[in-house]
Amino acid sequence: MKNLIFKLFIAASAFMIMSCSSSVDNKNVITINAGPQPKTIDPSLNTALDGCYYIIHTFEGLTTKSKDGKIVGGVAENWEILDNGTKYIFHLRTNAKWSDGKPVVASDFVYSWQRVVDPAVGSQYSFQHEPVKNAKAITAGKMPVDSLGIKAIDDYTLEVVLEAPTAYFLDLVAFTTFYPVRKDIVDKYGDTWILNAETYIGNGPFKAAEINQDESIIMVKNTNYWNVSEVVPQELKFVLMQNETASVAGIKEGSIDFSRILPTQDIQSLMKEGLLQIKPMLASYFYCLNITNEVLSDIRVRKALALAIDRNYIVEQVTKGGETPANAFVPYGINDAEGSFRENGGGFFDISAENYKKNVEEAKKLMAEAGYPDGKGFPVFEFKADPGFHISIFEAVQQMWKEHLGIDTKIVQEEWAVFLQTRYDKNLTMCRGGWFRDFNDPINFLGLYASYSPNNYSSYSNAQYDAYIQTALTTGDQKVRMEAMHKAEELLVNSYAIIPMYFYTEPLLVNPKLKDVYYDALSMHKFTYASKE
């Protein structure tokens, strides 16, 4: 009976996917599964990768990425860099329009950036704006919102003043948190403006046609987009689902063209079938430990937990996607003043397969010193994560901790939106974490663990660490910046407030007929130029 019910569920899922598409054979319609219902698709408030999928197709910032991944003008046609790199003058395209036909003007960016840093709004990504003059003081409630270093000179000229020269600024403003939103729309509809296609007004290559809660988001080509002639698909159809088996079924029958959701245990077989591709990704996977917890406040316990994990087993036997075991936080591919930040910085503890037994012995010794010999007296901690491969990974870790340290843990699964709120509220003892590069600079990772960061889920607080981060944010000397960030990373990793697990790759289910997708190392893949053979 259970098998019959499961088969009926998969059939129903496939029917739902097909019913979302009026013509699955239409080469101008791309059907995508980026995951279940996103928590938000508001550019100013989104903090999750899945939300970015929808936002990058319906909105556009001052800059954007070309087909080959280079930073080029988006709404801004060109710009000037003045005052030793601390002032930018952006000249906006006069033919840039919102999807309802209204022009995109400089004041739209002023409103949107001020909205992000407004403490009353509470954007969790407000830290991204810290290079902008006064942003940090505003989010701390020490200065008024209108003191932010952004000003509309006229409708098509925007001035931005920075705290210090910021080499990655043009890359930064291509990120979703810097996209414009419409003040009149937000004022009129409040938080509900993102829930209906009629009010979800953007300025990107596509516009919302349907928003069906927990089912689908359907987009059509935005004829008011300034560069509409380069947009290939007529429609993008996002099916909102978590079911891995249904995703595979959809790819095989042609009702889905692309899916982030897949059964990781089947990676090798799906590759052999030609249905799966593995893409590089600049991202870190790690565990967050709440160091305000009485037991986890002891660094000996945290270090023991980290050392008792066999990362090589995880990537070879569990994830199987070509990931790299991690003994640091910032991933490979992030730039240093010269060369690679990761290669220059190296690792902070030995994670080689041949050294694992030594790590386990040290972990046992540390637990005994902390008062928990063979796990005696150690409490049963909850580990929180969203469903999917995160659970499979922790089940392996759970067994390692039980076998080598004698401790028990309990897995608590939470749906995606609930889990995001749990982490933000720090309602946890330990949980899974992951960070995908927003722009190519180590500060994008290391800034997360400044004491004031809303994304500091471990409640890590270190005055010296904050000082290093402040140096990285306020000096224009790249060598000084990078030296400070190397020192910051060393402090963070050696605190074991986080447990680095591995550096990501990204396995994706892809219809073999799908071509010309822009695959991004941030995992914000674009379908603007995609088509099907």
Per-segment meaning from a language model:
Residues 33-83, 201-202:
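N-terminal lobe/hinge region of extracytoplasmic solute-binding protein
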